[in-house]
């Protein structure tokens, strides 16, 4: 075979990705010849279906199926390469057990909670859903119904769900699975800056001198970005990489400063760095005086456990967790003074010389620094504090909001930013950083949505972990989940998740593509379309919004989540779900369906079907008779335009490889809050953190506080959970790709060889991982990619046959309500198979 240089480069990239998973090099063949006249393939762009990096891929279709993908060479994010998951995108939709018809638990021809799943029609599915919703609403009100959504929802799916629940059904009990991964990042941004989402962008990678990873294994979780970090590190001799984690992983291979610290002591390290910056005279005084104020956050705030838990009863400020008082720089300096190098080395276990070298990276005024973090910071009972403390360091030094200087929170899902955060599908949020507790914010949403004043409830709804508890307690009775698998991904499954789903008083609906663990525990399963089987939009970690067209049809009777939400809204009239006093404010809405009120309101339905680009299918346009995606997007965009969240016109995104908001006058923003880059910054001001009225960011004084649970005599090991390169989240897609499944078929218990020896275990021994809440069986791994220190084990959560979340603790950050999956106590027992 004769290859051009371009073909060779593409084949080589494919080979590298394949080799990472131990796959045959022949994978290159599917990514070589792409000319349509040779292959009869039709190629279109789409963002990758997996992580929050937002890689763009070229998708090939033929005879109504996706048959190949390759990296999009025109994309700024990934520049033509993909990780190993991205190279197998063409296979994720075609698992042999794809769901194609609604399935209801039935016995003797009718619904039975203990019955077997039997196929029914969509009409029957919506009939029983409407019956259950209406009965719960009539008996107990809006608090009795809820929804669990996703950072994998498209922008308009999340927006439609938000409208349906918060305005239509008047229930704020809607929360995304991003609560498990990004809620602490959200609250960190909101507290420090008054606005959500990163100020920097991926361009920082090529502009910086230093990378510091805090609880982020980018080599496996953001591998395409890691390739850019690696290129920068190997291309510029002055560049340094520091990696901090509770165990050694693949990102350590590039580290100049590798640091394994004891769980929870990242808080101590962060405060030490701030102290070092102050004591060494490295504070950027001019920046701090002009752009920063100081606050002391509430302490002893509890652990987000049930109110009757002894730890919650003991906490002094559990009900005031998100409060603070103003202090000055001098008081802040006194606060961090006890966090000395000696104390930090002793309590964290990191050698003093490495800690000092890390602090000097930040303190050196000649060095630019990018701090990256993911779940190690966010899945943390003090995750919001950890986010605030890293911002402290960048603010004290002025290393922020400019090329190469950036604190950068990386997201895990393809639209955790674009949908969960920006659309506001959390139980306390509305679009564009508005919140349900603020009367002016509710008024803004009600006006845009054209519903009566008072429609949106002011009480915050149940967050993700609370939803499980309320199902368990019988408070929440009808529950619909889409694009999520909480029976596998949620914490403390056996005590808090499963009992609520199987509670005979509750009715649970799961919309999904495959029969996941969650689907198998549900009462009604709805088959969903996925990825390019529908038109969609995602928003990635650098504020980049990306669109794609529908390229193929979904199999059987599978329907998009958008269609399901909008079609279901036809089953309710305002008389059935709104009180008389609310209808009295808008008598013209009396008797109308929620579909009429929310989706045929003169805004969502104002774009005709003829606006659809020629040559593309759109099943929702066919179903509803208008360009619903465009209408939903433009209505949603009204929340942010003119308020620092500006989005471009709908059609611009189909032409571009994504645009980073705010987009003003057709120009995207790469660095927020900095004059010359951000159109919202006043001329001559240099920097304005305009999320707060005084345009200043806040530096927080926050202490070290211990975790909710730590090893003891009965449970002597720390347990951390997480992911691996080859699988994504719960593996419901990647485990159905033969090559990825073959590469990593099972979750393993990674542990230190000396711990294994002391327990008379060896590599491959089958063990039980046991906590106070549950247990699983798995095999020991003492070699390979993950190298825990003594006293800690790591188990990934992708394996549906080894549900590690039977074991985890449902402690959460009291401010963000995000679960700490990185710290609980377990013991390891050898299985006696005799």
UniProtKB/Swiss-Prot annotation:
Substrate binds at residue 797. One of its GO terms (molecular function) is iron ion binding. Its main location: periplasm. It catalyses: 2 Fe(II)-[cytochrome] + nitrate + 2 H(+) = 2 Fe(III)-[cytochrome] + nitrite + H2O. It comes from the Bacteria. Its cofactor is [4Fe-4S] cluster; Mo-bis(molybdopterin guanine dinucleotide). Mo-bis(molybdopterin guanine dinucleotide) binds at residues 85, 152, 177, 181, 214-221, 245-249, 264-266, 375, 379, 485, 511-512, 534, 561, 721-730, 805, 822. It is found in: Periplasm. Keywords: 4Fe-4S, Electron transport, Iron, Iron-sulfur, Metal-binding, Molybdenum, Nitrate assimilation, Oxidoreductase, Periplasm, Signal, Transport. [4Fe-4S] cluster binds at residues 48, 51, 55, 83. Residues 1-29 form the signal peptide. Residues 41-97 form the 4Fe-4S Mo/W bis-MGD-type domain. Its EC number is 1.9.6.1. The keyword Metal-binding applies. Catalytic subunit of the periplasmic nitrate reductase complex NapAB. Receives electrons from NapB and catalyzes the reduction of nitrate to nitrite. NCBIfam families: NAPA, PRK13532.1. Component of the periplasmic nitrate reductase NapAB complex composed of NapA and NapB. Belongs to the prokaryotic molybdopterin-containing oxidoreductase family. NasA/NapA/NarB subfamily. This is Periplasmic nitrate reductase. It comes from Pseudomonas aeruginosa (strain UCBPP-PA14).
């Amino acid at each position: 075979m004769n290859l051009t240089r371009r073909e060779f480069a593409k084949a080589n990239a494919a080979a590298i990705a394949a080799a990472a998973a131990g796959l045959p090099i022949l994978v290159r063949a599917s990514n070589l010849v792409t000319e349509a006249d040779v292959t009869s393939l039709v190629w279109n762009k789409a963002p990758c279906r997996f992580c929050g990096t937002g890689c763009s891929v070229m998708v090939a279709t033929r005879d109504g199926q996706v048959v190949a993908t390759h990296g999009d060479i025109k994309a700024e994010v990934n520049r033509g390469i993909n990780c190993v998951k991205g190279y197998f995108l063409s296979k994720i939709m075609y698992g042999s057990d794809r769901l194609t018809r609604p399935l209801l638990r039935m016995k003797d021809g009718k619904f039975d909670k203990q019955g077997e799943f039997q196929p029914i029609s969509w009409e029957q599915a919506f009939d029983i859903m409407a019956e259950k919703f209406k009965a719960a609403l009539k008996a107990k009100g809006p608090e009795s119904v809820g929804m669990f959504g996703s950072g994998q929802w498209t922008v308009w799916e999340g927006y439609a769900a938000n409208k349906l629940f918060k305005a239509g059904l008047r229930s704020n009990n809607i929360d995304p699975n991003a609560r498990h991964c990004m809620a602490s990042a959200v609250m960190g941004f909101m507290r420090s800056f008054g606005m959500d989402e990163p100020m920097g962008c991926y361009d920082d990678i090529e502009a910086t001198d230093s990378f510091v990873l805090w609880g982020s294994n980018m080599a496996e979780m953001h591998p395409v970005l890691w390739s850019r970090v690696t290129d920068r590190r190997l291309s510029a001799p002055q560049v340094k990489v520091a990696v901090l984690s509770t165990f050694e992983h693949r990102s350590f291979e590039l580290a100049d400063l590798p640091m394994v610290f004891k769980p929870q002591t990242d808080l101590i390290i962060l405060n030490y760095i701030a102290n070092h910056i102050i004591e060494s005279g490295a504070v950027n005084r001019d920046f701090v005086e002009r752009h920063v104020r100081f606050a002391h956050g509430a302490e002893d705030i509890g652990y987000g456990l049930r109110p009757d838990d002894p730890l919650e009863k003991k906490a002094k400020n559990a009900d005031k967790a998100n409060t603070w008082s103003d202090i000055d720089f001098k008081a802040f300096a006194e606060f961090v003074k006890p966090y000395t190098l000696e104390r930090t080395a002793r309590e964290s276990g990191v050698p003093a010389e490495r800690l000092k070298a890390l602090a000097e990276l930040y303190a050196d005024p000649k060095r630019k620094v990018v701090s990256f973090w993911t779940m190690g910071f966010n899945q943390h009972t003090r995750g919001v504090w950890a986010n605030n403390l890293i911002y402290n360091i960048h603010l004290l030094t002025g290393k922020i909001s400019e090329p190469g200087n950036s604190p950068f929170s990386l997201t895990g899902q393809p639209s955790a930013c674009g949908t969960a955060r920006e659309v506001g599908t959390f139980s306390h949020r509305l679009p564009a950083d508005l919140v349900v507790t603020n009367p002016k914010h509710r008024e803004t949403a009600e006006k845009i949505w054209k519903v009566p004043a008072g429609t949106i409830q002011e009480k915050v709804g149940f967050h993700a972990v609370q939803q499980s508890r309320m199902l368990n307690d019988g408070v929440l009775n009808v529950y619909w989940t889409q694009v999520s698998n909480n029976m596998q991904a949620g914490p403390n499954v056996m005590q808090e998740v499963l009992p609520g789903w199987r509670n005979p008083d509750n009715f649970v609906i799961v919309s999904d593509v495959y029969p996941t663990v969650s689907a198998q525990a549900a009462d009604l399963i709805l088959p969903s379309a996925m990825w390019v089987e529908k038109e969609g939009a995602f928003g990635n970690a650098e504020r980049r919004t990306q669109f794609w067209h529908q390229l193929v049809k979904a199999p059987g009777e599978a329907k998009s989540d958008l269609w399901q939400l909008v079609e279901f809204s036809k089953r309710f009239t305002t008389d059935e779900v709104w009180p008389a006093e609310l209808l009295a404010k808008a008598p013209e809405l009396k008797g109308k369906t929620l579909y009429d009120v929310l989706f045929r309101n003169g805004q969502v339905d104002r774009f005709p079907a003829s606006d659809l680009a020629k040559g593309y299918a759109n099943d929702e346009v066919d179903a509803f008779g208008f360009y619903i995606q465009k209408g939903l997007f433009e209505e949603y965009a009204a929340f942010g335009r003119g308020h620092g969240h500006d989005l471009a016109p709908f059609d611009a995104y189909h032409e571009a490889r994504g645009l980073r908001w705010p987009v003003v006058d057709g120009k995207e923003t790469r660095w927020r809050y900095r004059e010359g880059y951000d159109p919202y910054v006043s001329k001559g001001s240099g920097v304005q953190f305009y999320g707060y009225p005084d345009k200043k960011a806040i530096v927080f004084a926050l202490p070290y506080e211990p975790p909710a649970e730590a090893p003891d005599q009965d449970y002597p090991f720390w347990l951390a959970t997480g992911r691996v390169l080859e699988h994504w989240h719960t593996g419901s897609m990647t485990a159905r790709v033969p090559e990825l499944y073959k590469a990593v078929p099972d979750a393993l218990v990674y542990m230190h060889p000396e711990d294994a020896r002391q327990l008379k275990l060896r590599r491959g021994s089958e063990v039980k991982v046991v906590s106070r809440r549950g247990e699983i069986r798995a095999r020991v791994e003492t070699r390979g990619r993950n190298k825990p220190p003594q006293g800690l084990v790591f188990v990934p959560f992708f394996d549906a046959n080894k549900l590690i979340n039977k074991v985890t603790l449902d402690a959460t950050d009291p401010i963000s309500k995000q679960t700490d999956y990185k710290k609980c106590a377990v013991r390891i027992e050898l299985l006696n198979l005799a």
